[in-house]
Swiss-Prot record:
Keyword Nucleotidyltransferase: no
Name under which the protein is recorded: Small ribosomal subunit protein bS16
Organism, scientific name: Nostoc sp. (strain PCC 7120 / SAG 25.82 / UTEX 2576)
UniProt xrefs under SUPFAM superfamilies: Ribosomal protein S16
One GO molecular-function entry: structural constituent of ribosome
Cellular component per GO, a single term: small ribosomal subunit
Family assignment from sequence similarity: Belongs to the bacterial ribosomal protein bS16 family.
UniProt KW keywords: Ribonucleoprotein, Ribosomal protein
InterPro entries found in the cross-reference section: Ribosomal_bS16 (IPR000307), Ribosomal_bS16_CS (IPR020592), Ribosomal_bS16_dom_sf (IPR023803)
Length: 86
């Protein structure tokens, strides 16, 4: 199963995260299928590849709870329901 989840990077105690599509059995910091965005919890900076995320969600990818909250704040789920599934 493909999951949209956070991949940690950055210095010790100064973590930043990439939002990635990965197999759910892969390591947290393993090689992703696709990088879809960036999240910095220290500054609340979020950058998303919305078309890529919408495509993955329509293909059946499941976001983790944290990624789901980030996507809800950015109104990505509204775009998923607005576009017809291909």
């Amino acid at each position: 199963m493909i999951k949209l989840r956070l991949k940690r990077f950055g210095k010790k105690r100064e973590a930043s995260y990439r939002i990635v599509a990965m197999n759910n059995l892969s390591r947290r910091d393993g090689r992703p299928l696709e990088e879809l965005g960036y999240y910095n919890p220290r500054t609340d900076e979020v950058r998303l590849d919305v078309p890529g995320i919408v495509k993955r969600l329509q293909q059946g990818a499941q976001p983790t709870d944290t990624v789901r909250r980030i996507l809800q704040k950015q109104n990505v789920f509204e775009q998923v329901s607005a576009k017809p599934a291909s």
